[in-house]
Amino acid sequence: MNYQPTSEDRFTFGLWTVGWQGLDPFGDATREALDPAESVRRLSQLGAYGVTFHDDELIPFGSSDNERGVAHGAGVAHQAVPAGAGRDRHEGADGDDEPVHAPGCSRDGAFTANDRDVRGTRCARAIRNIDLAVEHVARASTCAWGGREGAESGAAKDVRDALDRMKEAFDLLGEYVTEQGYDLKFAIEPKPNEPRGDILLPTVGHALAFIERLERPELYGVNPEVGHEQMAGLNFPHGIAQALWAGKLFHIDLNGQSGIKYDQDLRFGAGDLRAAFWLVDLLERAGYAGPRHFDFKPPRTENFDAVWPSAAGCMRNYLILKDRAAAFRADPQVQEALAAARLDELARPTAEDGLAALLADRSAYDTFDVDAAAARGMAFEHLDQLAMDHLLGAR
């Protein structure tokens, strides 16, 4: 099989992924800084469709209006990758990455900071960056990750008030986008913890519930990340299925994670391989049309010689899993096993003829054979082993 990616695969990378220098709380950088234009060029050569970037990654925090207007970095990124691939991640709008985005003042977050003046300046800054995204990036969307929106102490934050302020901030952004006539939507990225002890909107479910309380919920969706949901011990494909069901999967971050621990950002497929298989199967069967975006970090043990193969491995692993999932679905024995597991019945409404018909149907309760139903096996194990055979290349 040919697992060479093309632009039709819509694979994208954050500039901060291949550009990560290996700096962590316990050690200095192990790689030199990369020029963003070089990152874009190399990713394009590998077959990537586009790039994403943090709001201050190409135009530094504190730049003058004139400097922002030039937007040199955004122009380079847009020109060097196939057209229409850009996406501006306004993670700094939430004050997520303090050393890069806002020294000191966002130590308690941005939209939910206890300091009212900090909230005001961060909202204003987010609006300025929206203007930049719309002006310089084709088909822009903005991701909001509230990495510092949270607390370590129960007394430090009234979460109800904090959610009010979070709602207020997103409503202001939605109002501005609507007034300006911008074709732009917001994708909220959940994460349970790190860098804060506990972060607000920690999971896909929390974010989906929050969105329904906003004044313009149609402008907002989610940007789930594999590792973030798995840090909370959750089933990532299930979360994605619910986001798709709600029509709110605006973007997705693919990487690898091995269990409940710190955010590992492994290359895609290098963590929970079974979850990765079911995720690819779901995205492809659902016809998800958005980019397959990789938010990973080449390990700090590696030099630059391994950075680009690591990025290529993300795409290759996705394509291998896509091939394996397609073979699984096309297998006649799998079709038989799916029927034996009665997946077709799950797709049918329980009360197909409505409430009155259900209540009038004696077989639904009065004459229902409990013993016969209890004796039925579900045949899930055979179906799952067939999936394992395909995943492991044994079929």
Curated annotation (Swiss-Prot):
The entry's keywords: Carbohydrate metabolism, Cytoplasm, Isomerase, Magnesium, Metal-binding, Xylose metabolism
InterPro entries associated with the record: Xyl_isomerase-like_sf (IPR036237), XylA_actinobac (IPR013453), Xylose_isomerase (IPR001998)
Residues that, per the record, bind Mg(2+) 2: 225, 228, 263, 265
Name of the protein in question: Xylose isomerase
Cofactor(s) essential for the protein: Mg(2+)
Cross-referenced HAMAP family: Xylose_isom_A
Predominant localisation class: cytoplasm
GO CC, alphabetical: cytoplasm
GO biological process terms held by the UniProt record: D-xylose metabolic process
Disordered: annotated span: 80-108
Cofactor binding notes: Binds 2 magnesium ions per subunit.
Annotated localization: Cytoplasm
Ranges in coiled-coil conformation: none
Active site feature: 54, 57
Homology family: Belongs to the xylose isomerase family.
GO terms, molecular function: magnesium ion binding; xylose isomerase activity
Catalytic activity: alpha-D-xylose = alpha-D-xylulofuranose
Protein EC: 5.3.1.5
SUPFAM superfamilies in the record: Xylose isomerase-like
Ligand binding (Mg(2+) 1): 189, 225, 253, 295
Assembly notes: Homotetramer.
